Amino acid sequence: MTILNHTLGFPRVGLRRELKKAQESYWAGNSTREELLAVGRELRARHWDQQKQAGIDLLPVGDFAWYDHVLTTSLLLGNVPQRHQNNDGSVDIDTLFRIGRGRAPTGEPAAAAEMTKWFNTNYHYMVPEFVKGQQFKLTWTQLLEEVDEALALGHKVKPVLLGPITYLWLGKVKGEQFDRLSLLNDILPVYQQVLAELAKRGIEWVQIDEPALVLELPQAWLNAYKPAYDALQGQVKLLLTTYFEGVTPNLDTITALPVQGLHVDLVHGKDDVAELHKRLPSDWLLSAGLINGRNVWRADLTEKYAQIKDIVGKRDLWVASSCSLLHSPIDLSVETRLDAEVKSWFAFALQKCHELALLRDALNSGDTAALAEWSAPIQARRHSTRVHNPAVEKRLAAITAQDSQRANVYEVRAEAQRARFKLPAWPTTTIGSFPQTTEIRTLRLDFKKGNLDANNYRTGIAEHIKQAIVEQERLGLDVLVHGEAERNDMVEYFGEHLDGFVFTQNGWVQSYGSRCVKPPIVIGDVSRPAPITVEWAKYAQSLTDKPVKGMLTGPVTILCWSFPREDVSRETIAKQIALALRDEVADLEAAGIGIIQIDEPALREGLPLRRSDWDAYLQWGVEAFRINAAVAKDDTQIHTHMCYCEFNDIMDSIAALDADVITIETSRSDMELLESFEEFDYPNEIGPGVYDIHSPNVPSVEWIEALLKKAAKRIPAERLWVNPDCGLKTRGWPETRAALANMVQAAQNLRRG
């Protein structure tokens, strides 16, 4: 029984973000479709070759996507919303981009599909839309074309397909309500057709992703698995693939399925290998997800070997990444600025492939010398002084309940804030960032590269902040922001100014579409050596009589959008960050900043996948926010912002944050999200986002007014704010001005009644 290795997927964007650049060039009309397609082909060929060279036996095909793999699956099944369909019924790459972005080089613009987080990761998928009586047919053959590509290059391949039940679970019903699970029998024939096509190509194994099987699914959904997989069996071997959690609670459902193998995430799940071996059918292959696909840490391969060695030779076994390597940067070897000791603690996607090769070889041979050598740096890290800061650990241990309480309740604070700010009804504001123009990015880059001295850099940033204030005053906004010209990314910027973080040059991971992020890495205890945002906030406030918001990223979001340590709990990291940012709130307040926004867009996405684990997470997540904010005086207004959220199941915790104002992303869901605030009788102020900043389309005054009137039916108008869905960093100035002018006009119309 020779053990093989494989990955569940590989990063798509390219080491230098080639895919992003090609997408954006095509969208802007600066390159042709053929040029875009050529970049995709080149990246796929390179990535297959890199994995093969690193020692991977079975290469994933179908993990590449032009925007998102769930959207690719929608097109595969012919699930194209009516508003995005071509007149002749055809589907092309522009159809895909219109669903993702709301517009493309061809076709009519229309509202983009809703976007939400992929399970509990920082990747976003485009939510499939389902309507009653919908028809499905094999429409978009990208998967088959890419399999042909890989076979022509001589690779041993394993196609990757999002499973039918997870696909339905991830979608939403539009229009007349019905049970979307009822569509299962309509999509299964398309899956059968795809599997038949793969069988014709001589494919032995297909990785069929059903991560929904790690959730606490309703019984009806669990019951659907057996008939669905009965219909899919027989043409190729199916590797039922799960990740992000363990499968033990649903193992009875899984073991009844007519599949030939199971992949389990042995990093994030609590599954016991011996129990899995005992309960799985003896002729099933077990794919052991031993290498963390979601983090950047080098694995202790001696531990991984010990975890799996007892079942070697007792059943067919593969070793794999825990999930797709999509969530990891590509290659550590190009990081030239990382300190050698710190660099020795990391492994990116290609290094993780190498780890899988080392592990496979050791399991096949019994020789573990190479594993011990590889694991030495990560074992040495446990005692490094760069990891432990006794002062931080002491301060954390001394936290009391009082540290997470504002001095007075919201009603008392609101009165003090009204007296201080005297804002009109329907106050208008933005979420924080303004367009990051080429000039701003060039300025930061030149400074970073040493081509610009500190004085000239600061003069340049000050000029952009001044421009942002002038623009906002001209537009008539009520509460201003400084525009964040000095910030590259809302998490990276804070990480750069906090001890305990390190940064990469090329550690990019895909967030959605062409958007990539370069998450900081938490390597040790977190503290704040000096004020971070105070100087620029103070400068912006000096330019205007209107209030300017101080802008902070909250502790849970910094945690969730960074690569965390693996040697302490997430709670510990979040509270260390909260204490550091608490000092920032106090310093902003002392500098005369009266409104401070602490963004927590990631609070909900950090939820454990199983509801039974939620309470513990929410308790420390809320406490971290409150530790951060509680130092503020009564007449300092604390705002928070959240996006891509379903709130109804965590409203108690949202209210427990005790923010004076919460701004939320609601435009794509047509204000549906406000229902949960209404039902809960949310007591504080709310700014429901009135237009979707992820789309370049400019909303009309009438559209915004209609949304606000809809909002006022759910929330008393005196507690409503008017704002976009999210920051405006990725937009251009022309559409930003136009959209904000319409937003301000809508608010003024409502004030006049």
UniProtKB/Swiss-Prot annotation:
L-homocysteine binds at I431, G432, S433, E484, D599. The active site is at H694. Zn(2+) binds at H641, C643, E665, C726. NCBIfam families: met_syn_B12ind, PRK05222.1. Belongs to the vitamin-B12 independent methionine synthase family. PANTHER family: 5-METHYLTETRAHYDROPTEROYLTRIGLUTAMATE--HOMOCYSTEINE METHYLTRANSFERASE (PTHR30519). This is 5-methyltetrahydropteroyltriglutamate--homocysteine methyltransferase. It comes from Escherichia coli O45:K1 (strain S88 / ExPEC). The lineage of its organism: Bacteria, Pseudomonadati, Pseudomonadota, Gammaproteobacteria, Enterobacterales. The gene is metE.
